[in-house]
Design a protein with these regions (language model features):
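Extended catalytic-interface subdomain
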Residues: 86-90, 101-200, 208, 288-331
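An N-terminus-focused feature that recognizes amino-terminal "leader" regions
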Residues: 1-151, 167, 174, 314-316
Length: 368
């Protein structure tokens, strides 16, 4: 899989990386009630560091993570709210040369965004579900926000210890997973690094995990196995395809999760006690504190301590849905570069149980 997203070397434009991708820059969010987003991001440790000079757009940061809250009327984000409700209307990518990346993508078949409702004055194309992908090349020596935003406080505050965007997952209509794999592959030379076939108690999904040539942009794509599953449920609630969850990396997941829990962030139901009792059999040689894992339901995956003493462990936990059907993942990688595939079934059934408790499946399935 290569380097972790936050430690990969700076990209160059090459045959392997023809668009010159170099990582996530931001995720944009919009909500009919923007204060809901402010309260949520504050609870997660983010700080309002800057505001747009002429638009109702706020920049919230923590570590190397940037979120935009867009409350400006008449924008692409405002139109997105009309269709989807609370939503993630765009993501920004770091690229070596924004104009080059834009022209390359359009030449390969991307739809350029020609509207006047951009969050930032940079090139953009239309992506998943009508969301946008912005191309940003001011990020290495200078902030991309200096031109259009007024700074309120110092950039990149420590917050509660989340420090980079690890991956961002899409949910798509049944039959469209390959279409979107082709989109990312043809335009940006993404490649598949994992394929999953997950079966819960009542529903299932397929997932293709993709990574960019630079190694910093990871996008799993999910589609439902059937007609009544949780991906179908998301698509109904969101009124279309889009971003299912955003995963952020922690320096110390236990301290970070304790902190956001105290601030009111709630998580998906944790696994049964047997999960933790069996964790040493599944993740050999780990010495993670079971009591702290169990406190909030933190999951563990990986090979454990492998030959030669190398550690390959991944720790992860998921918030409840907090922006419409969108949720967040909090992750700490200790030598493991996967997606917690050993936990997929536990997570899947946890989401399924939550949705069944809310009656999201109606009479289509019945509990055991």
């Amino acid at each position: 899989l290569g380097p972790f997203p936050h430690t990969a070397p700076r990209a160059t434009i090459s045959e392997q990386n023809p668009a010159g991708t170099d990582g996530f820059e931001f995720v944009e969010f919009a909500h009919p009630e923007p204060q809901v987003l402010r309260d949520l991001f504050s609870a997660m440790g983010y700080v309002h560091v800057a505001s747009h000079k002429s638009k109702a757009i706020e920049l919230w940061q923590q570590g190397d993570i940037s979120y935009l809250i867009n409350a400006e009327p008449g924008t692409h984000a405002a139109e997105f709210i009309d269709v989807h409700g609370p939503c993630a209307p765009s993501m920004g990518w770091r690229v070596v040369d924004a104009e080059h990346a834009f022209k390359h993508a359009v030449a390969k078949g991307a739809q350029p965004y020609q509207g006047s409702g951009k969050a930032l004055d940079v090139p953009a194309i239309v992506g998943i579900g009508g969301s946008l992908i912005y191309f940003i090349d001011q990020y290495f020596d200078t902030s991309p926000y200096n031109t259009e935003f007024e700074w309120i406080t110092d950039a990149h505050p420590t917050g509660v210890g989340f420090h980079y965007l690890d991956h961002l997952t899409h949910n798509v209509f049944k039959g469209n997973m390959d279409k979107w794999f082709k989109f990312y592959g043809d335009l940006f030379n993404f490649r598949e690094i994992r394929f999953f076939d997950i079966q819960g108690k009542h529903t299932g999904l397929f997932s293709r995990a993709l990574t960019s040539a630079c190694g910093r942009i990871r996008i799993p794509i999910n589609e439902d196995r059937g007609e009544t599953g949780q991906i179908v449920n998301y698509l109904k609630k969101y009124n279309g395809e889009g971003i299912q969850h955003i995963a952020v990396g922690a320096h110390d997941i236990y301290d970070s999760v304790d902190a956001i829990s105290e601030r009111g962030v709630r998580f998906m139901p944790g696994p049964p006690e047997a999960y933790y009792k069996m964790s040493h059999d599944r993740v050999v040689g780990h010495n993670e504190p079971i009591d702290r894992m169990q406190k909030h339901g933190i999951l563990i995956d990986g090979e454990g301590v492998v030959d030669g003493g190398e550690t390959k462990i991944l720790l992860q936990i998921f918030s409840k849905t907090v922006i419409g059907p969108i949720f967040f993942e909090f992750i700490q990688r200790k030598g493991d570069d996967g997606f917690g595939e050993g936990n997929f079934k536990a997570l899947f059934e946890s989401i399924e149980a939550e949705e069944m408790a809310r009656g999201d499946y109606g009479d289509q399935v019945s509990a055991d």
